Amino acid sequence: MTSRLIKSIATGLGLLGNQASAEGSYNGYEAPPYQVEREVGGAEVRLYQPHLTAEVTVKGAQSQALRRGFSELAGYIFGGNTTSASVSMTTPVTQRPSEKIAMTTPVTQSGDGDIWTVSFTMPREYTRETLPVPNTDTIRFVETTPERQIVLRFSGIAGTAKLAKQDATLQAIAAQAGVSLGAGPFYYFYDDPLTLPWN
């Protein structure tokens, strides 16, 4: 799935008759709750609720960075923390190009295509204060704010070319619908890497 933050939406786009919402789970795994506000040319405008994430910034090609980021975060939730506690697996794994961040924060990087931020959603039972402390300082916790995103779902093997094609499709849908885009793209990976591409 690919998505982008929304700056503004042209008036005249109707809301769905019965606004759809996600209960905050996917295939038995906890996921960030959202509400579908509109359908736009095969995409959905979603309002995501605030949630807590653990994230790392990694350098490399898209697929390599995803594997490295996933591995580091999986190590954390499977006990790579000061209390050796396990944290429940959630979905999705999120990947996005890193953006320039003010010098006062720990990570400053331009989104030149080889610097990526990979994140896991943390279970709702935790706060920043109650999560186990990571064994590494490369993992940071981020509390998201409500975010309106335009989202395009797709299946299959999500290689770099396919992700770029889906993002271009999403941008075209948004432009045609008068949706002004903000940050992105965000890539959401919901299924295990061993899931067959036609599932």
Predicted regions located by residue number:
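A solvent-exposed interaction/effector surface
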Residues: 2-199
